[in-house]
Amino acid sequence: MIEAFSAAEIIAAKRDHHSLTDPQIDWVIDAYTRGAVADEQMSALLMAILLNGMENREISRWTDAMINSGERMNWSALSRPTVDKHSTGGVGDKITLPLAPLVAACGAAVPQLSGRGLGHTGGTLDKLESIPGWRASLSNEEMLKVLQDCGAVICAAGAGLAPADKKLYALRDVTATVEAIPLIASSIMSKKIAEGTSALVLDVKTGAGAFMSDPAKAKELAHVMVGLGKRAGVKTLALVTAMDVPLGLTAGNALEVRESVEVLAGGGPSDIVELTVLLAQEMLELAGIKGADPAAALKNGKAMDVWRQMISAQGGDPDAKLPVARENTVVTAQSSGTLLSMDAMKVGMAAWRLGAGRSRQGEAVQAGAGIEIHAKPGDTVTAGAPLYTLHTDTPAAFTRALESLEDSVTIGEMPASGIDRLPLIVERIVD
């Protein structure tokens, strides 16, 4: 039996910089999920949390209350250890696509519950839905069957998983409270803990194209999430990784699937390969699998075999031709020299404006829309050489996409100190 409180007294407590008690948190999450606390009241509480923060105990209890609002998944029937990865998202971040089958090829089970894109960051499900026939929505029984048969599954979270978070996420989006670290951490971790994985690697992006552009804030978020995972009995660590430049050479849906398949075939851009292998090593070690060689599994075709099985098991055709946008245009370099910088946010916004992303939940995306990137920082370019190829089904979108790409690159002489950019791995966080 959950003790009853007044929403107003809980709002006032946080407004006045007090810590909320466990019973207060349990009640307000339960009551809001049931509709007994109004959106206006929860909006006020969320803003008070954003302004005044939460102690670790409060964040942990808030997370537990969201988990307890729904079901908890159980993978005890599997013969393999379970491990998952969560990325906070960015531009060209297609890492989940090659990573899940790679880790499965090395002996772990990967129950990857993914989401859709919003704004400039792409969604894993949107990318995979560009494969003809592929299904994002699976029942728990179907998920288990795919995991048993293939070792990896990538699908949407069911309605029964942390339903409190679904309501809170939608409310945060329209009340300017998205940025609150306690709310970000509890939103991510409530779903991941309820998912039932025994180990979790967090990929927290930072830099211009990331949700947490400030590295100090990204590290703070990573520490909070690692603590939440460990307190819940999930083996958890985080890598803070660079998102100042787009990952790989594509931003879009079908474009990123093609690039992921190149990686699984033993090729692909070096930054995608490096980060995929590093994350696979962390996941396998955390899952207790010794002696695995993910780099070899990419080269020898084992990861590709799992990919093909996984796509087929979810109704997709791994050999089907991927959608191609009807129109394209090329953006060229205005001068010659070294490409010194590329703004990931501007590239992501351009891809969104071309139709690769959405501005509201539920909006359709164009499978073939997006951007191919022909040069990255450190490359030598000549005036008139292609920098980007833009793809869309709606030619009118080119104008606004080109506006987004204005001043997205800097071209000049290579400084003696080299290019100033974030290392791919900014920090590894274990507590």
Go through the PLM ranges and name each one.
Residues 148-197:
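Phosphate/diphosphate-binding glycine-rich loops and adjacent basic-rich segments that engage nucleotide
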Residues 96, 114, 121-126, 157-158, ...:
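Short acidic, glycine/serine/threonine-rich loops at helix termini
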Residues 5, 9, 14, 19-21, ...:
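Well-ordered secondary-structure scaffolds
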Residues 113, 147, 155-158, 203-205, ...:
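Short beta-strand segments
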Residues 1-92, 309-313, 425-431:
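Acidic, glycine/proline-rich low-complexity segments that act as flexible tails and inter-domain linkers
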Residues 127-153, 223-229, 233:
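A glycine-rich helix N-cap at a beta->alpha junction
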Residues 51, 98-111, 191-196, 231-232, ...:
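Alpha-helix C-terminal capping segments
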Residues 81-104, 108-120:
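Glycine/serine-rich anion-binding loops at beta->alpha junctions
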